[in-house]
């Protein structure tokens, strides 16, 4: 099966001929590196926009000499010459489709021993051809500022996704794969990677109903296509509240001790009896923090967390389509269907994991919320309580911001503000700090590169080459980190092109960028894009800087964790390279990076004041972090609630009563059952975008967080810059991509053999370990 998550196997390719080498060399890191003689070059390209525009040839006023020195070639997005326009994207998609068809025809008609030995390799190449269009289109439609490009990406994605689904139900391809894997004379000559990829693709064929009758296979294709379209519609509307404003009676707000300055900024309705509080911007959130009237807060909070009825229908349709698809595949639920091949192999183990985590956390959560309960009880003139159930019953989600603010007014802290801290963490400081960290623990650095004309989709995008001290360039990261209208609002790591081996028979490298292995063979450079929405602030005439709050530093570290997995998981086959691994394993490297982002030793090395250059003091950081970490267990429990909601929306009850299933009713009933910060007022489930991308697997974040915590304490707590332990993590986990069983990777890193086989005991061990 040709998935959108794929990689290569195999025998060592022979060293190319001299003529081929000359052709290849044109594509090696062709963007010129910024001179490394300037020590702050990474910091400077992110913190000094004038410098960046000048060296990148974007400044119309730069000198003739500068224009000559930095003369730029013309190309398309990601140095793909087709991608200069929306029509070029369509052309690239058509050419890729033609190449896929030619490779397919060759595979169908080659029954020789050589054809069998290269069959899995060619399946992987076929996958790569399709995924380089599908992944590219997923990126463009989420990020590109040109609507015409976005529309073209949507069209190409639909076309290629449908073609891929047809191949996933192709009986002849599946039968040939089975014959290769079941023939000892052939399989004994295949590499471990080829066998792994072959098994993965065979499992995916079977998940597509390959053994069922043609009508069922056709239905599978139709359902998969519809799920993709409905899911994209759903995700496109998760940022929008149900209405643009909410009406609050003037008499209620005027008597709620809200600042008159804030009230004067609010419009009123025609009769002048109600304030119209917008559900966008800062006003509603400011009111949640300052309004003493609980009914007003409740109304505001509900409006901010609700969506339109149309969006609820999209979610309901998505959930029901998935249930129908799972039923078609003879599974009791979509969760059962989706969890095949994951670390947590079945819904029961997942739900047991979540419940264990909740049981271990609920008392701590109630204890964290006790200060809110005490303040609210005092306002309501009710007796104080220490009973967990009573505390949780009293404290509602619209109380959190108001009473937290009130608590700190009554108990002033000497901790610095988030704004004061952010002055030490410019975007350039943080990227430079990440490069320094990777250099010390992995022997890898980030090197800025000048881009060719047309290579990026916005002048704000920076290119970083990823350089290994042993191998040279091993990958490329395009950083689209500054806020811009039209971008996805969520931070994201997009795989644009996976790493894989380049084979001697391949001669056209015009649409990819190529690297060289130590043995002289060549590989497709992994290309990824990191997307965030950080806001620059004007600090002087024509000069702005991007100051990151510590939560944003953590976000950037998280996404760079994914990036390092993509760069270091350089297998021969693209089906298992980098982040092409089990969904409940893929977040582990990124969440581990969050531990680095919270470590005082790391932060004091990175934090330099933008004006004075002074290093941030450890005491200053400790005081600030203490003041912001007081609801940690609440956050864990909230994540567990979302994971349980995801399981609830994909369990066996959906198909049994599909006509009557109500997503909002189900959501609110679950909220009441799980007790903490109960939301039985909004339809927030329609704003939960991860229900599409992480359907039945949202538990992965919590699961990987508990594992990452154990790895941090085992390897890096004593020394976050340990090269020995960085190499250990790279050697036993990162370098394998999706080739090695995740449980085996974790067992090797932790030196804990009992985890190797996974299963319910291993899941229980991980869940219980969260208590520490």
Swiss-Prot record:
The keyword Translocase does not apply. Belongs to the peptidase M3 family. Keywords: Hydrolase, Metal-binding, Metalloprotease, Mitochondrion, Protease, Transit peptide, Zinc. Its EC number is 3.4.24.59. The lineage of its organism: Eukaryota, Fungi, Dikarya, Ascomycota, Saccharomycotina. It is an enzyme of class 3 (hydrolase). This is Mitochondrial intermediate peptidase. Zn(2+) binds at residues 558, 562, 565.
């Amino acid at each position: 099966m040709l998935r959108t998550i794929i990689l290569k196997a195999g025998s060592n390719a022979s060293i190319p001929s001299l003529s081929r080498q000359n052709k290849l060399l044109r594509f090696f890191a062709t963007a010129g590196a910024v001179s490394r003689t300037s020590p702050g070059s990474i910091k400077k390209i992110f913190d000094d926009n004038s410098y960046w525009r000048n060296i990148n040839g974007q400044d119309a006023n730069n000198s003739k000499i500068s224009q000559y020195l930095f003369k730029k070639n013309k190309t398309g997005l990601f140095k793909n010459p087709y991608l200069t326009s929306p029509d070029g994207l369509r052309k690239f998609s058509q050419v890729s489709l033609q190449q896929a068809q030619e490779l397919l025809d060759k595979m169908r008609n080659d029954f020789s021993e050589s054809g069998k030995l290269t069959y899995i390799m060619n399946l992987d190449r076929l996958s790569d051809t399709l995924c380089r269009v599908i992944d590219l289109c997923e990126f463009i439609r989420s990020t590109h500022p040109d609507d015409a490009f976005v529309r073209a990406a949507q069209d190409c994605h639909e076309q290629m996704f449908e073609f891929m689904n047809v191949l996933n139900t192709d009986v002849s391809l599946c039968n040939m794969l089975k014959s290769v894997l079941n023939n000892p004379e052939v399989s004994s000559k295949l590499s471990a990677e080829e066998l792994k990829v072959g098994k993965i693709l065979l499992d995916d064929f079977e998940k597509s109903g390959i053994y069922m009758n043609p009508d069922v296979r056709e239905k599978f294709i139709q359902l998969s296509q519809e799920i993709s379209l409905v899911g994209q519609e759903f995700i496109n509307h998760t940022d929008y509240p149900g209405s643009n404003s909410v009406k609050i009676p003037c008499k209620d707000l005027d008597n709620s001790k809200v600042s008159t300055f804030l009230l004067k900024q609010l419009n009123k309705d025609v009769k002048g009896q109600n304030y119209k509080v917008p559900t966008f911007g800062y006003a509603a959130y400011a009111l949640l923090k300052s309004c003493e009237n609980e009914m007003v807060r409740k109304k505001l909070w509900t409006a901010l967390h609700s969506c339109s009825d149309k969006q609820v229908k999209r979610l309901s349709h998505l959930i029901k389509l998935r249930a129908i698809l799972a039923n078609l595949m003879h599974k009791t639920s979509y969760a059962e269907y989706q969890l095949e091949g994951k670390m947590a192999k079945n819904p029961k183990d997942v739900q047991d994991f979540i419940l264990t985590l909740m049981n271990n956390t609920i008392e701590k959560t109630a204890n964290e919320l006790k200060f809110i309960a005490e303040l609210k009880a005092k306002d309501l003139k009710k007796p104080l309580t220490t009973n967990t159930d009573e505390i949780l019953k009293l404290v509602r989600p619209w109380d959190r911001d108001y009473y937290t603010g009130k608590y700190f007014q009554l108990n002033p802290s000497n901790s610095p503000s988030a704004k004061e801290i952010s002055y030490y963490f410019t975007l350039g400081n943080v990227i430079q700090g990440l490069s320094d960290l990777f250099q010390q623990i992995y022997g890898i650095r980030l090197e800025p590169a000048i881009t060719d004309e047309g290579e990026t989709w916005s002048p704000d995008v920076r290119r970083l080459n990823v350089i290994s001290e042993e191998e040279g360039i091993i990958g490329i990261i395009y950083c689209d980190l500054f806020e811009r209208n039209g971008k996805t609002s969520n931070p994201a790591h997009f795989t644009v092109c996976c790493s894989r081996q380049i084979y001697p028979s391949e001669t056209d490298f015009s649409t990819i960028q190529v690297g060289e292995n130590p043995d002289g063979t060549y590989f497709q450079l992994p290309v990824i894009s990191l997307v965030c929405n950080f806001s620059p602030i004007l600090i002087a005439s024509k000069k702005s800087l991007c100051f990151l709050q510590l939560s944003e530093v953590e976000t950037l570290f998280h996404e760079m964790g994914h990036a390092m997995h993509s760069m270091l998981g350089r297998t021969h086959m693209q089906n298992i390279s980098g982040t092409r691994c089990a969904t409940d394993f893929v977040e582990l490297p990124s969440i581990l990076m969050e531990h680095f982002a919270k470590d005082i030793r790391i932060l004091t090395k990175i934090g330099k004041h933008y004006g004075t250059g002074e290093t941030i003091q450890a005491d200053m950081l400790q005081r600030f972090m203490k003041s912001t970490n007081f609801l940690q267990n609440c956050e864990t429990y909230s994540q567990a609630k979302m994971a349980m909601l995801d399981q609830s929306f994909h369990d066996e009850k959906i198909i049994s009563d599909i006509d009557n299933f109500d997503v909002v009713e189900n959501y609110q009933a679950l909220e009441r059952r799980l007790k903490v910060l109960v939301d039985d007022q909004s339809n927030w489930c329609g704003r939960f975008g991860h229900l599409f991308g992480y359907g039945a697997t949202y538990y992965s974040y919590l699961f990987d967080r508990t594992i990452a915590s154990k790895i941090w304490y085992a390897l890096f707590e004593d020394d976050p810059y340990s090269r020995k332990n960085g190499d250990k993590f790279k050697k036993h986990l990162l370098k394998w991509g999706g080739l090695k069983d995740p449980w085996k990777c974790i067992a090797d890193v932790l030196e804990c053999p009992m985890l190797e086989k996974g299963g319910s005991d291993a899941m229980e061990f991980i869940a219980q370990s969260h208590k520490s």
